[in-house]
Amino acid sequence: MRPLARLLYRLEIEGRVPPGPCIVAANHESMLDPPLLALTASQPLHFLAKVELWRYPPGAWLMDALGGIPIRRDRRDLISLGRAEELLRAGESVAIFPQGTVRGGAWSRGAARLALRTGAPLVPVRIVGSRQALSGRRIRFPRLRVVVGEPLLVEQGRPTVATARALTRVLEERVDALR
């Protein structure tokens, strides 16, 4: 898939997601972001995705086949975060878009809470250009960049609202700095 993406979108990937359990956290511009993010990792990523993607059989089948984790965005979804925590403790990697939507907004503290509970590193990723690829009535093929930052090493412990909020702020700044 990487050669096709490089050809169609002039895709440029800087850096790689490190092997081993980690939490990949990226900005969210379009529905192209999950496959672009998957191209940065040598191991499968389990995406936390809005539960609405499971409402229809084709979407449910695809999300299950890709190891997706359904999450309710209208409230704290402790069941989904618990499933993500189990995967991290089993050596798997999890991907999350802390903005929760392609329209932007405040970053949720879920990625920070997972990192604090498991000690898994947070990997900041910036995706540039995917919004332009799917804007308007026709598909465009702009230049796309995916920049993987240095992992944020986090000490495992009991997350408090203050520590999760502070870590989320640092993560957001790291993602924004990747240009």
Locate the predicted segments by residue.
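Short hydrophobic helices that act as membrane-entry/anchoring signals
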Residues: 1-9, 60, 64-67
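A generic local structural motif
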Residues: 8-16, 32-34, 81-83, 109, ...
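Catalytic core of membrane glycerolipid acyltransferases/transacylases, capturing the structured
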Residues: 16-75, 83
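Non-catalytic C-terminal accessory region of glycerolipid acyltransferases
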Residues: 79-179
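Conserved catalytic core of Hanks-type protein kinase domains
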Residues: 7, 40, 65, 87, ...
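A short, well-structured juxtamembrane/interface segment
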Residues: 2-21, 154
